[in-house]
Regions:
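Flexible, gly/pro- and Lys/Arg-enriched active-site loops
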Residues: 93-96, 134-157
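Short capping loops/turns at secondary-structure boundaries
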Residues: 112, 144-147, 166
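Glycine-rich anion-binding loop/nest that anchors nucleotide
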Residues: 131, 162-168, 185
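Active-site-adjacent loop and "lid" segments of alpha/beta metabolic enzymes
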Residues: 31, 142, 164
Length: 217
């Protein structure tokens, strides 16, 4: 078992961009600098053709570095780009349908867990993970307190892994890890880091190595 398997790990979310080739290069740098479990690529405002092009750039890079590549958007794009799975946000009924259609062949995780009741409804559907926060929710240096509270509550009682959205500073991974969450998602903290994505990932992993609780302690 790798040392990182026993503590909170990183999830990367590339921000919206018109220069997908530059972002692909940034992702390559980031993933080459340290452990990342998963890359989630959102559709944002792209049309299906633009999103397909983005996925064809991002998915192979993630997979080449051992990270799962998930598509947040059109499931057809996930299939055509040979992504590992889907990040789903929508109704409980649609989540159940998506899980029935795509699992166990693909990873299917779920967002939209804005409060405890909704989180438990999502959990009953048995996704592969639950996501606390909004994909574009890294508007402050630190994670949103509500998301930290939800993650701590969830991690203490439910076996389904959770991802908590971090802040726009790398140091926010510590607060996220302290909740007991299995994963912390970073977006702007990595892709807009003043020293570059590689420095951000190296720093984040160093902080998690030093300060994240161990699951089997």
């Amino acid at each position: 078992m790798r040392e990182t398997d026993d503590r909170c790990r990183l999830v990367l979310i590339p921000p919206p961009t018109e220069d997908i080739e530059k972002q692909a290069q940034q992702l390559e740098e980031a993933l080459g600098a340290g452990d990342v479990a998963t890359v989630i690529l959102p559709q944002y405002g792209r049309d299906d053709q633009q999103f397909q092009i983005a996925a064809e750039h991002i998915v192979p890079i993630a997979q080449a570095h051992g990270a799962a590549a998930l598509i947040a958007g059109d499931s057809r794009t996930a299939g055509r780009s040979k992504a590992d799975g889907l990040h789903f946000e929508g109704s409980i009924e649609d989540l159940r349908d998506t899980l029935a259609k795509h699992t166990p062949k693909m990873i299917v995780g779920a967002g939209g867990a804005s409060e405890r009741h909704k989180a438990l409804e999502i959990g009953e559907a048995q996704p592969d993970y639950i996501f606390f926060g909004k994909i574009e929710g890294d508007i402050k240096p630190e994670p949103h307190p509500k998301n930290l509270a939800l993650a701590e509550w969830w991690a203490s009682m439910v076996e389904i892994p959770c991802i908590v959205m971090g802040g726009n500073e790398v140091a926010s991974v510590v607060a996220a890890a302290e909740t007991g969450a299995e994963f912390v998602a970073l977006r702007l903290a990595v892709f807009e880091h003043p020293e570059g994505p590689a420095a951000a990932i190296a720093t984040a992993n160093a902080l998690l190595d030093e300060k994240a609780p161990r699951f089997n302690a």
